[in-house]
Amino acid sequence: MNPTYQLDRSQQRITVEGVTYTAAEIGRISVPESTPEMEHFVEELKSFLQEWFDPSPTLTVHTSGSTGIPKALCVRKAQMMQSAQMTCRFLGLRAGDSALLCMPLRYIAGKMVVVRALVAQLDLCLAVPSGHPLARIAHTPTFAAMVPLQIYNSIQRKEEQIKLMGIKQLLIGGGAIDTALEQAIHTLPGAIYSTYGMTETLSHIALRRLNGKQASPHYTPLEGVHVALSEAGTLCIEAPLVCDQPLITNDIARLYPDGSFTILGRKDNVINTGGIKIQIEEVEQALKSILSQPFAITSLPDPKLGERIVLLYTGKALAPEKLDILPKYQRPKAILYTQEIPLTETGKINRPACRSLAAQLQ
């Protein structure tokens, strides 16, 4: 029989494998399997709960490292709770609802699932972080947060797809959502959102509806969040509940009169080739219609152009003329073949690693 850990509400405490944590508000913690991997995941949860309930008002979180070396940040627990409350209010989560924890607890996304369970008194179902988080859970959760790869994999298997369809509130973050995946989930019955945020904002500060009649290409800031553009055209975030100071991001954005916004790409994902600045994400988006295997756009130094555009591709030999769908100035000058595209632990393209790989393969 799989264990369930029940909160003693009279004394506001929770016991996980014999260890009691005071002041917790999680309803239940359900562990659907007993494996070495799950035991390790439970240990990670216990460690986080110990850190959460110790007297310190702060804890340390780490960035994913998708654009550089991962860094440690000291954040306030009170602000994490404010972030969780903003999300729970927006999604209408309440005591007795259930949340799926299928993200690594090393990063802010996983930690915030637990904090949302704390502030909203949600039941918490554990699934070892993997590409198929729904495979072994017995009951479909009310709420889940996943990365695009987990969603894609879940759609491929009928049993997992049925569970995915039963999730009422689903957040997708940690990486770009391509057009094909967005189309595949458009008719699912639950409310599905793409998230925008970062470790510095304690996960997301804006959501974009992906399915149903309310689907939109724009991100809508959560309550209490205001956005503007810097002189460089990057998004500025003012979210006093979760950030002490306004945050200037590296994300090039476009604002709309209703306060919503779209992200065009990252300022540091620009290739300057022959004096023309190319946004990497724009090229990748255009190529998704013709490339069926994982790929990434990166660059290499060029004595004439300064930088030349390079395509890293995991598929079979690609006819160069297929790239003619791109304007001439956006076309890769080289196609380099690799077995896999470097990713961070959270599933984002690891841009520095891609540049290093291209240098090795040329």
Residue locations for each model-derived region?
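Conserved C-terminal "lid"/linker of ANL adenylate-forming enzymes
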Residues: I271, V310-T314, K322-Q362
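AMP-binding/adenylate-forming core of the ANL superfamily
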Residues: H226-I248, I252-R254, L312-T314
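AMP-binding/adenylate-forming
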Residues: R76-Q82, S98-N153
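Conserved pre-ATP/AMP-binding loop-to-beta segment of ANL
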Residues: E44-H62, A95-S98
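AMP-binding/adenylate-forming catalytic core of the ANL superfamily
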Residues: I252-Q330
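Gly/Ser/Thr-rich phosphate-binding loop
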Residues: R157-K213
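Conserved AMP-binding A3 loop
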Residues: P57-Q85, G92-R94
